[in-house]
A protein has these predicted regions:
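A charged, well-structured terminal subsegment
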Residues: 183-206
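Residue-level signature of catalytic and energy-coupling elements of molecular machines
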Residues: 2, 37, 82, 93, ...
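Cofactor-cradling patches in redox/metallo enzymes
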Residues: 89-96, 101-170, 183-185, 190
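Glycine-rich active-site/cofactor-binding loop and its immediate structural neighborhood
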Residues: 69-103
Length: 207
């Protein structure tokens, strides 16, 4: 249903306004309702898909496309096949104006490192739903540090908690997908991973 709605709106409204003041705001509201346990995963997935389709239609009317705020590499930890959370976060990052390099699920540490070296993102995110796989994020962050790459490494997913995410150098935590763009904004504003940890509660606010 979103296709005809966006197409009709484009007759009188600029595409960026449709994206930023319509679709993105709508998804932010969905994120709040999810945090309040009014919406659950099925509603989040449906809203994310609707928003993705709507943004794709609106973006086609922007000469040269939208200017990217920055690049982020996203993946699911090695050995872990669960990618729903990562997919939702990726949609929310794209809708917020970021270029997402989505590596998919069960991504080997060397592949993550190689992608970071090639793409030069300002942030790398990993998710894990299994406790047996979350250690790959800690190991991956160590490889980046050893190579002199000091970008924040966001750890997320059902198996991950804040204590784990902040137990290794570069590590920061995201509890829910809607928090990812909020944290990304602070990184672009100059916050390093230590500053993100220090102000985490204020950054994520009510999400």
């Amino acid at each position: 249903e979103i296709g005809p709605v966006v197409t009709n709106a484009l007759k009188t409204i600029q595409p960026l306004e449709i994206i930023n003041k319509g679709l993105v705001v709508g998804m932010e509201i969905v994120g709040v309702l999810y945090a309040q346990h009014v919406y659950y995963l099925p509603e989040i997935m449906m809203a994310a898909k609707v928003m993705e389709v709507g943004i794709a239609i609106a973006e086609k009317q922007i000469p040269g496309g939208r200017t990217s705020k920055g690049k982020v590499v996203m993946h699911v930890a090695e050995g872990d096949p669960h990618d729903i959370g990562k997919n939702i976060a990726a949609v929310m990052m794209r809708s917020s104006g970021y270029e997402v390099i989505d590596m998919g699920k069960d991504v080997a540490i060397p592949d993550v490192v190689a992608c970071v070296e090639k793409e030069k993102p300002f942030l790398v995110t990993g998710t894990a739903l299994m406790t047996t796989t979350m250690g790959a994020m800690k190991d991956g962050a160590k490889v980046l540090v050893d190579k002199g790459i000091k970008i924040p490494y966001m750890a997320a997913g059902g198996a991950v908690n804040r204590d784990f995410a902040e137990s290794f150098e570069l590590g920061i935590y995201s509890e829910k997908a809607p928090q990812t763009p909020l944290i990304a904004e602070k990184i672009l504003a100059g916050y390093d991973y230590l500053k993100i940890r220090e102000e985490w509660d204020d950054i994520v606010g009510g999400e």
